[in-house]
C-alpha cells in the first residue's frame, strides 16, 4: 500500500533484513493477521536511509532497537489487533532492556507516533509517494504509555522471584530499625521459632545471604567436624552444583550421578555406603531442574542405618511440600522461594550440635551465628519483618494444598495439548514444578519469549533447559489462579496447536 517497492507478479517480497529480524506476529486461529519486525543489529534500515543515524541523532544510548514493517490485514485494522500488537512489541523491548527505539514513521501516522512518545530528529526521507519520518523513543524517559505497559498484570510460573502477599509487601515499606534493638531481637527469635516448627527441626539459624550461603555454611560445618569424606547424589543441575561446592570446601567427595531426572537406585546406594568410607551424604530434596522430588524418606533410612551424617538442600521443597526434616542432620533453605518472601535470608535447620569453626571465615560459622541468635552481623529489619509475616501462611496446610491443586490442573491441561511432560517415577513426581520436553521442531526459547510478551513468565532461559529444549512451570506463586492457567494453556494452544 505504501509504494516504496517495485510491483511484482507474485505480490511477495523478502525483506532485505529478514535473516536478522525478530518478528512479533498476531494470529487468529492458524492465520497470521498482523506483524511487526524488530532488529537490534546495525546497520538498521534507518541507518541506510540517513547514511548513519548517529550523524543526526545526538543523544546517548547503549542498546538500540529498530521497529519496522507494521502490517495488519485490512479487515482487522479496526479491531484491537493494532493495540495488542503494539503492547506485545513494547513488552519485548522492555523485557530485553533496550534503551532507545528508532522508526521510519509513515507521515500519515505522525500523530499516533507522537502519542506513543516518538520524536522526530531529522527531516523526512524517502520519495514523494513513500515519505518517512526518522523518529526515536527514549525508553529511559518518562512515558505514560510505557509506564502503563510496565505495570500490566503478570502471570508468574517462575520458581523465583515469587509473588508476595500484600501484608508481606507492607513490611517492606516499614521504617528500618537497628538489628541490635530489643524489637529486632524479639522479631528474630519469633521468626526462628516459626521456622523450627515448619521444618520440624531442633534449631534454625538465619544468615544474611542467598540459599547458596546456607549450603556453604553446612559444608563448613562438615569440614569443621572432620567429616571430610562424602557422597553427593545428583540427578539434575542443583545436585551437580553441590558436587562443585563441596569440592571448593576441600571435602573429598564421590558423586553418585544418574541421568537428568532419573531416580537413584536405593539398593545401589545402600551398597555404595556399605562399601565406601563415607562421613556424610549430601543431596537435593526437590531437584527443580527436572521436577523430581527425591525419595528422602527412603534415602534417610539407608543413610542413618549406616550412622552417616545427612545434609539436604531443600531450597525449593521447603514451603512447597510439607515434610518433617527431623531425621536429617542439616537442611538448607531460604526466604525467597516457597516461603514467598524476599530473597536475602539464608536458613539452616539442624538436628545436631553446631561446632565452632576457628579457621573458617566468620561469615560461614553457623555456631557463631546461632550463638548470636542469628544476629552475628547487620541484618536488614525489613527482610526479617517480611519473612516473619510470610511464615504465618503456614499455620495451616492451605499453601501446600493450593500448590498441588494448581500443579494437577496444569498437568491435565498440558496433557490435553499433547505436550510431553518429563517422565518421573510416580512416587517422586514433584508438585512444585512441571517440566515439558518440547519436540525438536518447537523452540523452547521461542515459546518462552512468546509467552513473555503476553506477560506470562515461565522458566526457560537457564542453559541446562535450553540445551535440552525444555520449559518449566512452577506453582509456588500465590497469585496464580486456575483462570490464569486456562489463559496460559489457551495461548500455548494458539501458538503451537494441539501438537
Task: State what each model feature region is.
Residues 264-315, 319:
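Active-site phosphate-binding strand-loop segment of PLP-dependent enzymes
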Residues 17-19, 31-77, 131-132:
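Conserved acyl-donor/pantetheine-binding loop and adjacent beta-alpha core of acyl/acetyltransferases
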Residues 415, 420-483, 487:
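Conserved C-terminal alpha-helix-loop-beta "cap" of PLP-dependent enzymes
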Residues 201-231, 235, 239-243:
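Conserved beta-loop-alpha segment that forms the PLP phosphate-binding cup at the N-terminus of a helix
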Residues 93-105:
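Conserved GNAT acetyl-CoA-binding A-motif
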Residues 77-91:
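Conserved acetyl-CoA-binding loop-helix of GNAT-fold acetyltransferases
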Residues 163-164, 336-412:
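Active-site C-terminal subdomain of aminotransferase-like
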Residues 153-208, 212:
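A glycine-/small-polar-enriched, mobile loop at the entrance of the PLP active site in fold-type I
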Amino acid at each position: 500500500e505504501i509504494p516504496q517497492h517495485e510491483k511484482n507478479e507474485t505480490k511477495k517480497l523478502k525483506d532485505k533484513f529478514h535473516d536478522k529480524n525478530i518478528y512479533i506476529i498476531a494470529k487468529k486461529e492458524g492465520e497470521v493477521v498482523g506483524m511487526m519486525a524488530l532488529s537490534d543489529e546495525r546497520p538498521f534500515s534507518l541507518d541506510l536511509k540517513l547514511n548513519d543515524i548517529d550523524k543526526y541523532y545526538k543523544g546517548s544510548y547503549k542498546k538500540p532497537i529498530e521497529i519496522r514493517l507494521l502490517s495488519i490485514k485490512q479487515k482487522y485494522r479496526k479491531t484491537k489487533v493494532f493495540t495488542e500488537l503494539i503492547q506485545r512489541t513494547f513488552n519485548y523491548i522492555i523485557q530485553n532492556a533496550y534503551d532507545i527505539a528508532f522508526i521510519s514513521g509513515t507521515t500519515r501516522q505522525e500523530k499516533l507516533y507522537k502519542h506513543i512518545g516518538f520524536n522526530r530528529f531529522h527531516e523526512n526521507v524517502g520519495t514523494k509517494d513513500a515519505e518517512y519520518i526518522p523518529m526515536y523513543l527514549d525508553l529511559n524517559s518518562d512515558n505514560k504509555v510505557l509506564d502503563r505497559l510496565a505495570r500490566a498484570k503478570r502471570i508468574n510460573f517462575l520458581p523465583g522471584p515469587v509473588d508476595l502477599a500484600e501484608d508481606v509487601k507492607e513490611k517492606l515499606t516499614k521504617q528500618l530499625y537497628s538489628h541490635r534493638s530489643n524489637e529486632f531481637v524479639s522479631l528474630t527469635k519469633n521468626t526462628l521459632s516459626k521456622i523450627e516448627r515448619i521444618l520440624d527441626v531442633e534449631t534454625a539459624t538465619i544468615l544474611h545471604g542467598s540459599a547458596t550461603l546456607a549450603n556453604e555454611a553446612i559444608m563448613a560445618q562438615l569440614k569443621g567436624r572432620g567429616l571430610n569424606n562424602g557422597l553427593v547424589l545428583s540427578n539434575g543441575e542443583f545436585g551437580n552444583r553441590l558436587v562443585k561446592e563441596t569440592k571448593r570446601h576441600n571435602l573429598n567427595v564421590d558423586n553418585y550421578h544418574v541421568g537428568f531426572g532419573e531416580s537413584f537406585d536405593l539398593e545401589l546406594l545402600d551398597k555404595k555406603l556399605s562399601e565406601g568410607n563415607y562421613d556424610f551424604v549430601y543431596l537435593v530434596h526437590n531437584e527443580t531442574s527436572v521436577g523430581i522430588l527425591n525419595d528422602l524418606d527412603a534415602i534417610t533410612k539407608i543413610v542413618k542405618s549406616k550412622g552417616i551424617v545427612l545434609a539436604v538442600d531443600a531450597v525449593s521443597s521447603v514451603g512447597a511440600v510439607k515434610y518433617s526434616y527431623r531425621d536429617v542432620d542439616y537442611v538448607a533453605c531460604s526466604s525467597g522461594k516457597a516461603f514467598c518472601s524476599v530473597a536475602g535470608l539464608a536458613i539452616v535447620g539442624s538436628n545436631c550440635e553446631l561446632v565452632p569453626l576457628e579457621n573458617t571465615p566468620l561469615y560461614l560459622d553457623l555456631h557463631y551465628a546461632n550463638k548470636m541468635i542469628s544476629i552475628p552481623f547487620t541484618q536488614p529489619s525489613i527482610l526479617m519483618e517480611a519473612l516473619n509475616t510470610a511464615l504465618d501462611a503456614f499455620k495451616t496446610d492451605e499453601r501446600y494444598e493450593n500448590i498441588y491443586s494448581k500443579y494437577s490442573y496444569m498437568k491435565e491441561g498440558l496433557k490435553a495439548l499433547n505436550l510431553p511432560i518429563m517422565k518421573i517415577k510416580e512416587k517422586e513426581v514433584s508438585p512444585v514444578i512441571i517440566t515439558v520436553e518440547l519436540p525438536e521442531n518447537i523452540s523452547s526459547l521461542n515459546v518462552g519469549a512468546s509467552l513473555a510478551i503476553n506477560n506470562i513468565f515461565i522458566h526457560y532461559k537457564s542453559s541446562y533447559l535450553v540445551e535440552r529444549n525444555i520449559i518449566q512451570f512452577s506453582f509456588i506463586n500465590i497469585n496464580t489462579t486456575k483462570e490464569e492457567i486456562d489463559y496460559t494453556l489457551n495461548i500455548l494452544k494458539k501458538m503451537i496447536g494441539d501438537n
